[in-house]
Amino acid sequence: MADGSGARFPRFSELCAKYAAQLAAAETRSVYAFSARPITGGEPVSLGFLRGRVLLIENVASLUGSTVREYTQMNELQRRLGARGLVVLGFPCNQFGHQENAQNAEILPSLKHVRPGNGFEPNFMLFEKCEVNGARAHPLFAFLREALPAPSDDMSTLVSDPQLIAWSPVCRNDVAWNFEKFLVGADGTPVRRYSHRCQTLAVEPDIEALLPPPARGYYA
């Protein structure tokens, strides 16, 4: 189609195709391009269904010295801020001291009866075991490490004992231990990374800054 000057207007189909290409390019810079299989099995779930939510992503382990504290705090954060748009995601990983050596089907019973125990059940999204470093790293974690090369609270964090490194290649942006944290904004863009030394609840102020204010009458 052209106007009186002879200039050609783009067809509607061309505009739609251009917009779709722009969306696809944006997806590659966000977590929405990735999927993961729930710990209970079934088909992989696209993280695109979490569009508009603030995400806290952690690599977790059920036999770590921090397991009780971090799992409990992850539950607490989800309870406090879930209604306002926070979604906590946990990815079991056995790359650090072999502290997640159970099969996928054994992890939930272990959490319930051993650590944290006392009937504990995660109220956040837990996915199947994966690797977070090396050639077989889950694509989501490869993306997160590239986007956020070092924890903001400890830029020098590295695996303390080289004998514990059980993956290849080794990269400067590798996750150093269980319970590192990646905060992702509501647009799917990684915002901040935290070391395993940073407790989960310590991230709450940064999460609050990304969430809408509580509705009147809301109580945590």
Curated annotation (Swiss-Prot):
The active site is at U64. During periods of oxidative stress, Sec-64 may react with a superoxide radical, irreversibly lose hydroselenide and be converted to dehydroalanine. It catalyses: 2 glutathione + H2O2 = glutathione disulfide + 2 H2O. One of its GO terms (biological process) is response to selenium ion. The record marks U64 as: Subject to oxidation and hydroselenide loss to dehydroalanine. SUPFAM superfamilies: Thioredoxin-like (SSF52833). One of its GO terms (molecular function) is glutathione peroxidase activity. It comes from the Viruses. Keywords: Oxidoreductase, Peroxidase, Selenocysteine. Its EC number is 1.11.1.9. CDD domains: GSH_Peroxidase. May protect the virus and component of infected cells from oxidative damage by peroxides whose formation may be stimulated by infection. Belongs to the glutathione peroxidase family. This enzyme has been acquitted by lateral transfer from its human host and has retained 74% identity with cellular GPX1. This is Glutathione peroxidase. It comes from Molluscum contagiosum virus subtype 1. The gene is GPX1.
